[in-house]
C-alpha cells in the first residue's frame, strides 16, 4: 500500500514538472522559427516573419496558461546596430527604445501577465465584440518587437515566481491597453516603470463604468487571479458621470459600487487604491488656458469613499489638470 502511495505521489510530481516545463520557451531568434499555430504553440504571429535585413516590426507568441511569466530578451545583432522597443499583449510597453551597437548585446527581464476570459466552469468575463480581436483575451502571450531597427537574439518565457506581486488595473479608456496607434493610456505605459518583481494586469476597457465593470464579471476575474498582498488600482468616474438611469449618481450608485470593490478586494487579502478620474482636455473658450470641470461630484464621491474606508488615493484628477494647463491648449 505504501509503495502504491509513493508511486502515485511520484507520478503527480512528475506530471507537475512536465506541466511547468511545457510553459517554458527558450527561443533562438537566429534560427528559423515557425509561424504560430495552436498546434505548435509558438512562433511568429500577426504579421509575416521579418526578412534577414529588414527593420520591420514583428510579433512572437507562445501558448501559455493564465498567469505571470518572466520574459528575458537578449537584444542586439552581430550584423547591425539596433534600436528596439518591446511591447507585450496590447501594446503594453515593457522596454523603451534600447540602442545597441553592431556586435553589442543587452539582456533584460520583465514580467508579463497573461489572461483569458475563463474564470471557472460556470463563469467567463463578458468581453465586448471588439475585444475578441485584442491580444489580451486569448490562449497566448504575445510580444511585439518594434522601433527603428529591431534586433533580437533570443527570447525566453518561463513561469514567474509565485511570490511575484501583481498590480491589477480596473478602469476605462484612460487606463486600458489601447489596441491601435496613436491611442494610448497611462495603464499601458506604467509597465515600463516596474522591475522584474512586479506584474501589471490591466483589466480596464473603454466605455466601462464601475457598475459595468462589475456586471461583466471583470472584478471576478481579478479576484480569481489575485493572491493575498496583491494590489488593485481603480480609476472610475469618467463614464459613470454620463449615466442618467434611475439610481445613478455620484453619491448613490457610484459610491455603492466603489464600496463593492473595496469589500471584495479586501476579502481576498488584497490592497486597493483609488485613482480620481483623468481630466478631459476641455479648455475654457474665452482664454483657452483653464481646464473646465466636467466630472461633477464624481471625484469628490471617490475621495469621500476612500476617506471613510481608509483607501489610499492617487489624485490624477488634479495632476492632469495641472499637466494640461502647463502644456497649454496647442501642445496638449
Each PLM stretch: what is its role?
Residues 23-55, 149-159, 165-166, 173-176:
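Low-complexity, Gly/Ser/Thr/Pro- and Asn/Asp-enriched, turn/coil-prone segments
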Residues 1-23:
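Bacterial Sec-dependent N-terminal signal peptides
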Residues 96-127:
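Extracellular carbohydrate recognition and processing domains
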Residues 67-74:
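A short tyrosine-centered beta-strand micro-motif
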Residues 1, 89, 217-332:
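Alpha-helical cap/lid subdomain in secreted, periplasmic
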Amino acid at each position: 500500500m505504501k509503495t502504491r502511495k509513493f508511486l502515485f505521489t511520484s507520478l503527480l510530481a512528475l506530471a507537475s514538472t512536465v506541466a511547468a516545463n511545457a510553459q517554458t520557451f527558450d527561443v533562438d531568434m537566429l534560427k528559423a522559427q515557425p509561424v504560430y499555430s495552436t498546434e505548435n504553440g509558438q512562433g511568429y504571429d500577426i504579421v509575416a516573419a521579418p526578412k534577414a535585413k529588414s527593420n520591420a516590426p514583428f510579433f512572437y507568441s507562445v501558448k501559455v496558461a493564465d498567469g505571470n511569466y518572466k520574459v528575458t530578451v537578449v537584444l542586439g545583432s552581430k550584423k547591425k546596430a539596433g534600436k528596439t522597443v518591446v511591447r507585450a499583449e496590447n501594446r503594453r510597453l515593457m522596454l523603451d527604445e534600447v540602442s545597441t551597437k553592431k556586435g553589442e548585446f543587452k539582456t533584460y527581464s520583465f514580467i508579463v501577465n497573461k489572461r483569458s476570459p475563463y474564470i471557472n466552469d460556470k463563469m467567463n468575463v463578458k468581453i465586448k465584440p471588439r475585444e475578441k480581436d485584442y491580444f489580451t483575451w486569448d490562449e497566448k502571450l504575445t510580444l511585439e518587437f518594434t522601433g527603428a531597427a529591431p534586433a533580437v537574439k533570443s527570447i525566453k518565457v518561463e513561469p514567474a515566481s509565485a511570490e511575484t506581486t501583481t498590480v491589477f488595473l480596473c478602469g476605462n479608456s484612460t487606463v486600458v491597453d489601447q489596441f491601435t496607434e496613436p491611442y494610448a493610456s497611462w495603464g499601458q505605459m506604467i509597465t515600463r516603470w516596474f522591475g522584474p518583481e512586479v506584474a501589471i494586469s490591466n483589466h480596464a476597457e473603454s466605455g466601462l463604468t464601475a457598475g459595468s465593470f462589475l456586471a461583466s464579471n471583470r472584478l471576478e476575474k481579478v479576484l480569481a487571479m489575485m493572491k493575498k498582498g496583491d494590489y488593485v488600482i481603480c480609476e472610475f468616474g469618467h463614464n459613470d458621470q454620463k449615466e442618467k438611469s434611475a439610481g445613478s449618481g455620484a453619491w448613490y450608485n457610484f459610491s455603492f459600487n466603489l464600496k463593492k470593490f473595496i469589500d471584495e478586494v479586501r476579502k481576498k487579502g488584497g490592497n486597493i487604491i483609488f485613482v480620481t478620474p483623468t481630466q478631459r482636455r476641455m479648455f475654457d473658450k474665452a482664454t483657452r488656458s483653464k481646464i473646465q470641470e466636467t466630472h461633477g461630484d464624481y471625484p469628490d464621491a471617490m475621495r469621500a469613499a476612500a476617506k471613510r474606508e481608509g483607501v489610499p488615493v492617487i489624485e490624477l484628477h488634479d495632476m492632469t489638470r495641472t499637466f494640461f494647463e502647463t502644456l497649454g491648449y496647442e501642445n496638449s
